[in-house]
Amino acid sequence: GNGLVLPGASDEVTITVDPSRYGYLSVASMFVNTNDAFVGETGLSLKSLAVGESYQMSMNVWDSGTELNDELAATIPGPAGGGEGFNAARNDNNDVVAFHAGVISQDDGLANSALSANHRFLNPGAKVTITRVE
């Protein structure tokens, strides 16, 4: 993509593929103001799309389980926190990928949270549109 995508904004990426040779697409993106939330989908078929046709899907937000969701600035690598993100020395991981429950912000009563109400999200948390242009 073209960098940071703010809440409610969008980005557009054009790729060239030969659908008879490479008929599937995988996409992934991290929610930057979290320590380990992401969206991702693998194996999206491009083979049946006709020129001008689009496919759209809503994507759920996943928690990668690499660390505790404490919303502290020290653990959030995005602009809201500036922290280090993952650190193997910490022992707060659970190694299980699961649906993300969302974040708790200062506005929700977590006084030491690096996040505010504009960082909240619900599932689904992203939308992907694939359009065949030629």
Language-model features: locations:
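Extracellular low-complexity, O-glycosylation-prone Ser/Thr/Pro/Gly-rich "stalks"
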Residues: 1-2, 35-37, 41-43, 49-134
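Structured domain cores in non-transmembrane regions
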Residues: 1-50
